[in-house]
Amino acid sequence: MMEYKIVENGLTYRIGNGASVPISNTGELIKGLRNYGPYEVPSLKYNQIALIHNNQFSSLINQLKSQISSKIDEVWHIHNINISEFIYDSPHFDSIKSQVDNAIDTGVDGIMLVLPEYNTPLYYKLKSYLINSIPSQFMRYDILSNRNLTFYVDNLLVQFVSKLGGKPWILNVDPEKGSDIIIGTGATRIDNVNLFCFAMVFKKDGTMLWNEISPIVTSSEYLTYLKSTIKKVVYGFKKSNPDWDVEKLTLHVSGKRPKMKDGETKILKETVEELKKQEMVSRDVKYAILHLNETHPFWVMGDPNNRFHPYEGTKVKLSSKRYLLTLLQPYLKRNGLEMVTPIKPLSVEIVSDNWTSEEYYHNVHEILDEIYYLSKMNWRGFRSRNLPVTVNYPKLVAGIIANVNRYGGYPINPEGNRSLQTNPWFL
């Protein structure tokens, strides 16, 4: 019989004032935020937010503004915020950009922009302009008018508070277990020839500490830019956290990148060795390089006859180097009964490590548990994505970069822009 284990759960989110709330319970989380606030309230310079919209939406905008104002104060504990309105005349780039510039010139901490409908080229041109300028949040009138406004605003503000520099919640994990840092890295293709590399440093509690992306380069340049992007992200992280000792390091490699497995692993090992020599990580650092993959032929069932749903957090051993990990919650019908369906797991392959044989079994399960926990971290809303942030966040970046490039937006480059390097602008 195939070997498997279940991740020991009991995981909670930590929010403000040292309070904890259970994961996957939106009601309890919102209640906890109201009572105790987020884990970290953003530090604002102006206490001003710009709400940019067209006058034809005025009735709905009044409701929206009221909800944003009350929830920022009562749920997110950001007090004395003023929301200023800026009106654009027509849904064209120049008209909207002029109001964006006016808002920035008056001194605001962030911009919330309501568009009439989904216009892909306009959206990505505006989005890229704003990403390079100021924290922002987009909304669409057609969605605002057709959805539960309270639910929509609740989830939207999770993203916006994060972009402003706040931390809604973190994972309440054992500080003695897991990695000192996790690096989510890899590349994503823009087209058949070009790609860009990414690297993000995470704490084990799911917080992103630093991120870098490369310029768009050709596939033949992948390995060169993979190394340089990882080194940049670790340098940035260490410059900001000079006393942070890295004795346990894990690399989560993902993305649609060129198939050069051996060359890729060789470069990643070389990169770790160079980081050791430059004392960016401990000279005795214990590390593992993992391939995390959603696209594979495997499915997991609860039993051979598919009568039971596989438990969330099931770790299935395919070999000593490859595991499957189920991240999904069972789907419940309205009557509360479980709908039995096979689950598409995450494939985790250990392509390289420097663990001893005595450490191996323990460390494998520790990093698998860590991946499962990181799948419960998501600041795009109150529902977890069921994909570790080390993979999910780069996927979000990839979608933005690819579409900005496709639709002629402004190039996005976090290098030298501390706000983009340390805050999740891609949410």
Curated annotation (Swiss-Prot):
Might play a role in defense against invading genetic elements, using short nucleic acid sequences as guides to bind complementary target strands, resulting in slicing of the target nucleic acid. Binds nucleic acids with decreasing affinity in the following order; ssDNA, ssRNA, dsDNA, RNA-DNA, RNA-RNA. Association of the 5' seed region of the guide strand (nucleotides 2-7) with AfPiwi increases affinity for the corresponding target strand; the greatest increase in affinity is for guide DNA with target RNA. Other ligands are provided by nucleic acid. SUPFAM superfamilies: Ribonuclease H-like. Belongs to the argonaute family. Short pAgo subfamily. CDD domains: Piwi-like. SMART domains: Piwi. This is Piwi protein. A divalent metal cation binds at Q159, L427. Residues 147-148 are annotated as: Binds target DNA. InterPro entries: Piwi (IPR003165), RNaseH-like_sf (IPR012337), RNaseH_sf (IPR036397). Residues 38-167 are annotated as: Mid domain. Homodimer probably stabilized by DNA. Each subunit is capable of interacting with a DNA molecule. This is missing the N-terminal and PAZ domains compared to other prokaryotic argonaute proteins. Changing K127A: Reduced binding affinity for siRNA. Its cofactor is a divalent metal cation. The lineage of its organism: Archaea, Methanobacteriati, Methanobacteriota, Archaeoglobi, Archaeoglobales. The keyword Mitochondrion does not apply. It comes from Archaeoglobus fulgidus (strain ATCC 49558 / DSM 4304 / JCM 9628 / NBRC 100126 / VC-16). Residues 168-427 are annotated as: PIWI domain. One of its GO terms (molecular function) is DNA binding. Residues 118-124 are annotated as: Binds 5'-phosphorylated end of guide DNA. Residues 110-406 form the Piwi domain. Changing K163A: Reduced binding affinity for siRNA. It comes from the Archaea. Residues 150-155 are annotated as: Binds guide DNA. Keywords: DNA-binding, Metal-binding, RNA-binding.
